[in-house]
């Protein structure tokens, strides 16, 4: 099975960019936006059913004044248009963003995962990148294994498979 998807920057458009005449954007003040800066109209692609999944890169902490993780997560929940939604997380920022205290606290990732998992439209989680999972900054990999992924994940039914669940290979070891 092959799926077509993208992992776009978190912000499609800012609602605050009123000069652009777009009220469909998010309550953010991002300097870089998918549509206006990267010429990536992921909303159009989802509306037209051209993607099997979307995994937006929500690489911001909860409460960040420019792009608040919780607000942008809610925006993607509302604006995924039935496209399978996975959320990408910034493991690489843990203990590497001294300007922002949130990233020096491993519970920041816990807060984000709790928020993402509370939304039925979110069908999975992505972590960038495996390099940082191996480095296990502040024990974040242990936290993920011990508190979030202590049992094999349930695979969601996929529309591309007629809403059937894909085959899971149980030979893989979580350690």
How should each PLM-predicted stretch be described?
Residues 174-175:
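C-terminal accessory/binding modules appended to enzymatic or scaffolding proteins
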Residues 65-73:
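Active-site-adjacent beta->alpha loops and helix N-cap segments on the catalytic face
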Residues 1-38, 83-94:
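Aromatic-lined carbohydrate-recognition surfaces of secreted/lumenal glycan-active proteins
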Residues 74-78:
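Short, surface-exposed basic-aromatic patches at helix termini and helix-loop junctions that form
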Residues 39-65, 80-171:
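Substrate-binding cleft of secreted/luminal carbohydrate-active enzymes
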């Amino acid at each position: 099975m092959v799926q077509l998807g993208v992992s776009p920057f978190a912000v499609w458009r800012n609602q605050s960019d009123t000069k652009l005449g777009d009220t469909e954007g998010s309550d953010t003040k991002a300097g870089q936006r998918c549509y206006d800066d990267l010429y990536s109209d992921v909303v159009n692609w989802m509306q037209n059913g051209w993607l099997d999944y979307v995994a937006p890169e929500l690489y911001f902490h909860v409460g960040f004044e420019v792009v608040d993780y919780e607000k942008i997560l809610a925006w993607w929940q509302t604006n995924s248009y039935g496209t399978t939604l996975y959320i990408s997380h910034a493991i690489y920022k843990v203990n590497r963003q001294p300007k922002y205290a949130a990233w020096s606290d491993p519970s920041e990732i816990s807060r984000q995962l709790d928020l993402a998992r509370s939304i039925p439209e979110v069908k999975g989680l992505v972590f960038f990148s495996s390099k940082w999972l191996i480095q296990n900054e502040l024990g974040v990999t242990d936290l993920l294994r011990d508190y979030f992924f202590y049992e094999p994940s349930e695979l969601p039914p996929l529309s591309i498979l007629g809403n059937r669940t894909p085959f899971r290979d149980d030979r893989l070891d979580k350690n």
